[in-house]
Curated annotation (Swiss-Prot):
Its cofactor is pyridoxal 5'-phosphate. Belongs to the SHMT family. GO terms for biological process: glycine biosynthetic process from serine; tetrahydrofolate interconversion. The gene is glyA. This is Serine hydroxymethyltransferase. The lineage of its organism: Bacteria, Pseudomonadati, Pseudomonadota, Alphaproteobacteria, Rhodobacterales. It is an enzyme of class 2 (transferase).
């Protein structure tokens, strides 16, 4: 590029100068995050350091392969970043092998399937309606199209995992892989029981700990090891890192298969800037403050659930052992889709969610899913989450009394209280 063709602002102009339209959207999103309460259980707020790593010059570097075994030159420094992420992940989860290249939790699961399954093999995972995940064999997902997917659920009496059903289905269908974990499981999972069931039929055991990995790392939730053959996770959610995935194992033979399954199996060049963000987040998670944070995540979840129950709502399983809960709205006579939108107008962000044995359609639902990681990162404690619960009840009671079209005054009043609460706990003051 000659001086005549070199863009004079390419290396110096800010996004606001080069692309005001895009900058405006990002600025609006920053405002939303600052001014609204984030209760989506799968979301969190990363540190300025993680954002700096992810926005670094590592985004320029192609690095197909693994540290020390790349297909491109000039990888000596990205190797340092990836090795930091790997070593820190192994230390966090007390395991022997970690692949930090998956671009998402879904791709981490896909990598495991690629490594140990063939099309048509039987897998046994949790039913989506009971709290499982799309990648555990749901019909619309690739995992449900490529494999013979069988699903277990929860007991109707208490909405806890039906381990007797898991054993019966495993005995009947002889799966090659059993999956424990999901996207809406508020209680701890008995990994030893899953291991016993897997051993009884000669199956691999995969623990998908995408939602509770941060709790595991901090000792606030039982570890899947030594029971699991392999564990997968996202690196955001409770781990509070950039959006991405990871595969962990103690089995050296499986580790080689997982590495080959990710590259060259399902991915090409890894996202080195994201891996740098993972390394930064894992470094934060190794500090004592992270243990205190995760302890507060759980305490806040207990407080939120307790106050919602006091307000006349039901919590599936009666409470939570983790960061997440499912709120049953049926006692108030309203549905998840209506409540989700009303809370959004009040600047409380949630998602509608089916509950076990839900009589409503998936687009309607009888519940909403709530989580405490993002609010806890912001600095909210138990008293703030009790206040948030009361605000949720205020909106829901308003809907029940006034209907969706007549609830504007209630939502406006709650929106003002949300603004006051968020103002006490500001986000990203330097942005």
């Amino acid at each position: 590029m000659t001086d005549a063709t070199r863009d004079p602002g390419f290396f110096t102009q800010s996004l606001s100068e080069r692309d005001p339209e895009l900058f405006g959207a990002i600025t609006d999103e920053l405002g939303r995050q600052r001014d609204e309460i984030e209760l989506i259980a799968s979301e969190n707020i990363v540190s300025a350091a993680v954002m700096e790593a992810q926005g670094s010059v590592l985004t320029n570097k192609y690095a197909e392969g693994y540290p020390g075994r790349r297909y491109y030159g000039g990888c000596q420094y990205v190797d340092v970043a990836e090795n930091l992420a790997i070593d820190r992940a192994k230390q966090l989860f007390n395991c022997e092998f970690a692949n930090v290249q998956p671009n998402s939790g879904s791709q981490a699961n896909q990598g495991v399937f690629q490594a140990i399954l063939k099309p048509g093999d039987t897998i046994l995972g949790m039913d989506l309606a009971s709290g499982g995940h799309l990648t555990h064999g749901a019909a619309p997902n690739q995992s449900g199209k490529w494999f013979n997917a069988v699903h277990y659920g929860v007991r109707e009496s208490d909405c806890l995992i039906d381990y007797d059903q898991v054993q019966a289905l495993a005995t009947e269908h002889q799966p090659k892989l059993i999956i424990a974990g999901g996207s809406a499981i508020p209680r701890q999972i008995d990994f030893a029981k899953f291991r016993e069931i897997a051993d009884s039929v000669g199956a691999y055991l995969l623990v998908d700990m995408a939602h509770f990995a941060g709790l595991v790392a901090a000792g606030e939730h039982p570890s899947p090891f030594p029971h699991a053959d392999v564990a997968t996770t996202t690196t955001h959610k409770t781990l509070r890192g950039p959006r991405g995935g990871m595969i962990l194992t103690n089995n050296p033979d499986l580790a080689k298969k997982f590495n080959s399954a990710i590259f060259p199996g399902i991915q090409g060049g890894p996202l080195m800037h994201v891996i740098a963000g993972k390394a930064a987040a894992f470094g934060e998670a190794l500090k004592p403050e992270f243990k205190s944070y995760q302890k507060q995540v759980r305490a806040n979840a207990v407080a939120l659930a307790d106050e919602l129950i006091k307000g006349g709502l039901d919590i599936v399983t009666g409470g939570t052992d983790t960061h997440v809960m499912l709120v049953d709205l049926r006692p108030k006579g309203v549905t998840g889709n209506i409540v989700d939108k009303a809370l959004g107008r009040a600047h409380i962000t949630t998602n509608k969610n089916g509950i076990p044995f839900d009589p409503e359609k998936p687009t309607v639902t009888s519940g909403i899913r709530l989580g405490t990681p993002a609010g806890t990162t912001r600095g909210f404690g138990e008293e703030e989450f009790r206040e948030i619960a009361r605000l949720i009840v205020e909106v829901v009671d308003g809907l029940a009394a006034n209907g969706e079209d007549g609830n504007a005054a209630v939502e406006e009043a709650v929106r003002g209280k949300v603004a006051a609460l968020c103002g006490r706990f500001p986000l990203y003051p330097n942005l």
